[in-house]
UniProtKB/Swiss-Prot annotation:
Biological role: Mnh complex is a Na(+)/H(+) antiporter involved in Na(+) excretion.
Organism: Staphylococcus saprophyticus subsp. saprophyticus (strain ATCC 15305 / DSM 20229 / NCIMB 8711 / NCTC 7292 / S-41)
Localization terms from the record: Cell membrane
Superkingdom to which the source organism belongs: Bacteria
Family membership: Belongs to the CPA3 antiporters (TC 2.A.63) subunit D family.
Membrane topology summary: Multi-pass membrane protein
One matching Pfam family: Proton_antipo_M
Biological processes, Gene Ontology terms: ATP synthesis coupled electron transport; sodium ion transport
A Gene Ontology cellular-component term: plasma membrane
Subunit description: May form a heterooligomeric complex that consists of seven subunits: mnhA1, mnhB1, mnhC1, mnhD1, mnhE1, mnhF1 and mnhG1.
Spans traversing the lipid bilayer: 5-25, 34-54, 75-95, 109-129, 131-151, 174-194, 207-227, 231-251, 275-295, 303-323, 331-351, 373-393, 407-427, 452-472
Protein name stated in the entry: Na(+)/H(+) antiporter subunit D1
Predominant subcellular localization, coarse grouping: membrane
């Protein structure tokens, strides 16, 4: 009982932190420490919760006097626990990076409030056990993201925020419609109970289930930045400061991916493979369009932004395989991408602070004056491309292996070729930015960049440690994958085998 009650700490601590930030007022330095302390304390409880899950299996917390499926349920399995931990680590790094990057004006007002508010929504999305509360937590982190996008009030920010809000409001409307249709069919909102009841539906109801699936895919693909709903991502994510872009790129797209994986495994396993072919088709197109974008620009931010799309597609290929190997790859790669994307955005933020430009054609020769920055970026680039033994390799290895096991050889080849495109896109930044001809930047001995560079190095080191720990993590990732390719593990933990 005590162990299950600890799940709620993952939401309560960030919420208490939010309240504290409101009452602190216009004192940015205190806000920094409060936000960091709240995140660190939540991380400690997240590790405690993970340890409990590893010992006892998925843990369920039922709020109120009702049993599942009638109560509000929170469920923590290994994958959701790992996602929560990685989200908290990334958030701590982002808070530290923000000290020297977002500006005192943003820090004075609602910046840290919005960061913690968004973190609460992200964590809630990972641990909620019913579909309506998934919608609620989506709206929580979306409202926070609106605040983060407009803080600072530049013209570009406001313009891109309008587009971002319109896309997400439309997506949210379709989410409500999908939930309403699903409830009309099964009469429940509990994820595990929906899974049980959908599996018992007569075959004549398969048409309505397919329509519901299409609606959910539209909604979650929008959140994940997958094809065809990726068009908002490069513009909306380009506008705010680097710390906010790192936050969005590392966390928000992963919530959409998680929602696709969870609902596909629980709800749509019996739709004559239509759901998984659809996910695979969208995944491959996402990879292709992401690759085109990554090699089409000289802007360092846009190159990494399009690499977000490539990663989303690669992960969804693993999800579409819906076997143990594919899900292991998807989980490995999701955790890896959360860490390395944050690290790469941090690093290009340092490069911008030095050169005052994101245009590769306007700077070069940085390796002479900033060798630590250069070689740190090189390691991060290799990790992103999936070069062994760095963290990006293991996820892609399992995903490609899964495609070959299932006979989807072309899909595996697309994933492999995407690695070459990713490597080319980031090595181009490395070669031009650090070894190209210097184009006008001046070394400023008084430039305050060492703080954000230190955070960037820490992020890369954590990613490297994650890759080098792959053998130790393998049994944990294998168990995490089981709740997806064998959803009865999840449903039995919630419904007690009923």
């Amino acid at each position: 009982m005590i162990e299950s009650n600890l799940i709620i700490s993952l939401l309560v601590i960030p919420m208490i932190t939010i309240i504290a930030l409101i009452f602190i007022g216009k004192r940015p330095k205190i806000k920094r420490y409060v936000a960091l302390a709240g995140t660190a304390l939540t991380l400690i409880f997240a590790f405690i919760n993970l340890n409990n899950v590893l010992k006892d299996g998925p843990i369920t917390l039922e709020l109120g006097s009702w049993d599942a499926p009638y109560s509000i349920v929170f469920v923590l399995d290994i994958f959701s626990a790992l996602l929560v931990i990685t989200s908290l680590i990334v958030t701590m790094l982002i808070i530290l990076y923000s000290y020297q990057s977002v500006g005192i004006e943003r820090e004075t007002y609602y910046y840290y409030f919005a960061v913690m508010f968004m973190l609460t929504g992200v964590i809630g999305s990972f641990i909620t056990g019913d579909i309506f509360n998934l919608f609620v937590f989506f709206e929580v982190f979306l409202m926070a993201s609106y605040i983060l996008l407009v803080i600072g009030g530049t013209k570009v920010q406001l313009s891109e925020t309008i587009k971002y809000v319109l896309v997400n409001v439309t997506s949210s409307a379709f989410f409500v419609i999908a939930v309403a249709m699903l409830y009309s069919v099964v009469g429940t909102l509990n994820l595990a109970d929906i899974s049980e009841k959908l599996s018992q539906l007569p075959s004549q109801d398969s048409g309505i289930v397919t329509i519901i699936f299409i609606l959910f895919i539209f909604v979650f693909a929008t959140k994940a930045g997958a094809f065809p709903m990726y068009i908002w991502l490069p513009g909306a994510y380009y506008a705010p400061p680097i710390a906010i872009i790192a936050f969005f790129g590392a966390l928000l797209t992963k919530v959409g991916i998680y929602a696709i994986a969870r609902t596909a495994s629980l709800f749509f396993r019996d739709t004559s493979n239509f759901s998984f072919y659809t996910i695979l088709f969208l995944a491959l197109l996402t990879i292709i369009f992401g690759c085109v974008g990554a090699i089409s620009y000289f802007d360092t931010k846009k190159i990494i932004l399009y690499n977000i799309m490539i990663a989303v597609g690669v992960i969804l290929v693993g999800v579409a395989m819906m076997n143990q190997t594919g899900m292991m790859g998807a989980i490995y790669y999701t955790l890896h991408d959360m860490l390395i994307k944050a690290a790469l955005f941090f690093l290009i933020g340092v490069m911008y602070k030095i050169t005052k430009t994101h245009d590769l054609r306007k700077y070069g020769g940085l390796i002479k004056d900033y060798p630590v920055l250069g070689w740190t970026f090189f390691i991060a680039a290799l990790s992103l491309a999936g070069i062994p033994p760095l963290s990006g390799f293991y996820g892609k290895y399992y995903i490609v292996q899964a495609t070959f096991e299932k006979g989807f050889y072309l899909s595996g080849i697309v994933v492999l070729l995407s690695s070459l495109v990713v490597l080319y896109s980031v090595i181009r930044i490395f070669l031009q930015g650090f070894f190209g001809k210097s184009e006008g930047y001046q070394v400023n001995p008084k430039l305050q960049y060492k703080g954000i560079l230190t955070v960037s190095i820490v992020a890369v080191v954590i990613s490297v440690i994650f890759g080098l720990s792959a053998d130790w993590l393998q049994p944990i990732i294998k168990d995490a994958a089981e709740t997806f390719y064998n959803p009865s593990v999840y449903t039995d933990s919630v419904l007690g085998g009923k």
